Amino acid sequence: QKIAKGQWKPIRDVNEIDPKDGYDVISTIDVYVQDIAHHALLESLQKNNAEHGCVVVMETKTGQIRAISNLGKDPKSGNYYETINYAVSESHEPGSTFKLVDLIALLDDNKVDTSKVYDSRGGVVTYRGKRVVDSHKGGYGKISLGQGFEKSSNTIMVQAVYENYNSNPQQFVDRINNMGLNKPLGLPFKGEGKPKIPQPSDASWSAISLPWMAFGYGVSVTPLQTLTLYNAIANNGEMVKPLFVSEIKEWNKTIKKYNKQVINPKICSISTVNKVKALLENVVKRGTGEKLYSKDFSMAGKTGTAQAN
């Protein structure tokens, strides 16, 4: 048989392997949800002139990823392109979204209840000369822990964590580790970002490590880890691993099926789950996420804002 560049090859070569059709990989992505998520992200990035961003939609019970979009801005053209998988690879300080960890720990360790009142102290509390400041100038006066979470008060959440864990910070860190935030999710592809959870035994641990962790600084997790944690609350405490592939087929015959993978069957008690769910709903109804509220949908969530300094 004559091949490229006028060369010949034997047609009965015993070493020749006949071509074979490859397998079909069936992803979990819903193209309609993906399209909506992608364009919503693009619109938000353009509106805020953001450098980059990501959005991920996870099915609560199964962990199947129904949409994932990552967009970064080209500094030359100003256009947005998908070049880096930020949702998977970017380990960063989560800011106020980490306050969910505070709440779970405080409630599950029976330290306080959501009705306990704290003083926001004019919106500023100080630890070893370092200030923790509320985004709302002047603070919120005296409010309950639950209200502090709904309003995303740094001073309230930090005081609650510091007051109850300063004598034994390892107990707080153990709670974080129990939620699986101290290790990667173990996704089946390269490039997953590594989380960073300070340990009291670390040489870098200081007097401000605990209060800074309480409002999401000094710690690093990926967006997908944050989503997996919040999904666990929606899933009544069961944490499931994100799935990107549902099955592998050959000629419409299923070769392998990927089922739900449980990371932690119970990250906290059902009592804590129910209290946290109610507060996450209130964040949208009357808290920092109220702009998203609609009577037409059941929603819960938590806002998070990072600061540069």
Regions found by a protein language model. Give the residues of each.
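Flexible, solvent-exposed loop/hinge segments and secondary-structure transition points
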Residues: 44-51, 208
